[in-house]
Amino acid sequence: MPKIGVEHSLTSVQEALKAKGYEVIPLRGENDAKGCDCCVITGQDANVMGIQNTVTAGSVIEASGLTAEEICQKVEEKLR
């Protein structure tokens, strides 16, 4: 199952992704994103934890204004 990095403040997103069977990695620092297939961030900081510095080869999804279910759909789309 793909590894999904989720910013630690997005607990509802973490729970929703776990319920769908994904391995969820809480993102607290730059190194947490390494090895993740996709990362979900709050978008409060455009360059949160240096993720935009290509720490991860996976997609980065900004959660701003989206529900947990909408984010799960975006994750599934990115992983196809």
UniProtKB/Swiss-Prot annotation:
InterPro entries to which the protein is assigned, alphabetical: UPF0180
Domain of life: Bacteria
NCBIfam families, per the entry: PRK03094.1
Family: Belongs to the UPF0180 family.
Name used for this protein in its record: UPF0180 protein GWCH70_0946
